[in-house]
Amino acid sequence: MKIRQINHIVCVVVIYTMVAIAVTYFFCFYISPMWNEFGGDQSMFSIIGEGWKLGRVPYIDLWDSKGPIIFFVNMLGHSIAPGEIGICILQVLNIASVLILSHYFLSRCASVCNVVIFQIIFLLVYVLICSGGNHVGDTTLLLSALVVFLSYKWVLNVSIGIYNHSWKSAFIYGVFVSSCFLSRLTNGAIAISFSVVVVAVLAYNRMWGNLLASVTAFVVGFIVVFLPFAVYFGCHGAFHEMWYAMFSYNLEYAGHSHNLNPHSLKHLLYFISNFCCILFPVLLFVISVILRRRRKINLILALSVLPALCWAINSYAYANYAISYLPILFVSLVETQKLMKWKRVPKYAMSISLLFVVLYIRNYRIYYEGGPDANTRQSLMITKDVPSNETFVAYNVCPTYYIYADRRPCYRFFAT
């Protein structure tokens, strides 16, 4: 490798790391040292992660209705540095890795100027939906980006009659779906749908050997991630607890979660702004049919996002649920450029980007006082004179209390 290439790689890594630091520092306010603010869910993840580091087994000693991946990431964060600093470092590395990966993928499909614009749009949508950072979707964001890029590469080959699917890509799909299974199963909806499309295409073309290799690689990838967690929690007598928290409960939640007013204008605007990444491919397919070009590519992309889109429309899905789907936005932007035959992205693309900034400011206050809410402040005042080695009953206390008070919950259902 030449010195010039090494310098280019170093510059790319440094630039994207600095961008990731800025995004995390200013917008991921629940883990950023800039803000004295903690979210309810993020506090639970952090407390369980710290407890795991200290030897307290999730689900047995500290319980929450999530898969173990998010607790594992928070445990790693607390192992790197105390408090939320370690988690913040992991978030920076996560965002930087996604940007670096997207840089090398998009550079093959678009000019440098367009790559920058696509990444700006991606980041603006991310800060709109990230809800303070350290969410379940963040833990699988990098894998999601890799799966999307590998999938798109295969779709492009299919469009020119090359149907062979790489078993290595199938292995990555399995790793990603397993990671989603161990966090929130609906995060893997696009990958699962795309895998079904791959199976259908290979079966239709009677490529049985390639189909068998891909399915085997997918299963192996799934097992590689799932087995260590299954063995660990099984050895600690917590497998059934883990299974209920990561699968049974979330399946019930997804089945019974319905928006109270799905036809209201407010809900429609909320959905479009937060779930535009999975709405985009369907819109592009309609455009491709009208323009009569790139129809096969956009049909496969639309079929891949359709189940996730139907679920998001019908459920009471929070904005951060879209984080794991967000990398599909990169592919959609590339396809928009190809469909419209733009050499350069029009200037109004930046106007759309500014709209997301306005939406962000509207939904979240960029500058605010921070600190605990009124109930947590009252709880802190009541317990300020209680010695740290004493225990007490904490009824209806927000999990953020334990972080502000620097106390460790004794009861495993501390989040209820």
Describe each model-derived feature in a short phrase:
Residues S65, V196, Y368-T416:
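Short periplasmic/luminal acceptor-recognition loop of GT-C membrane glycosyltransferases, typified by
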Residues I89-S111, L146-F149, K153:
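Transmembrane-helix motifs of polytopic, lipid-linked glycan transferases
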Residues I100, S273-A308, L329-S332:
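Hydrophobic, aromatic-rich transmembrane alpha-helices
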Residues S102-Y126, L141-L142, G161-N164, K168, ...:
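Transmembrane-helix signature of polytopic, membrane-embedded enzymes
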Residues R108-A110, A145-I172, N205, I278, ...:
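Membrane-interface transmembrane helices that cradle and orient dolichyl/undecaprenyl
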Residues S166-L185, A191-V196, V224, S304-I313:
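Membrane-interface alpha helices of multi-pass inner-membrane proteins
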Residues A189, A308-R344:
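Hydrophobic/aromatic-rich transmembrane helices and adjacent perimembrane loops
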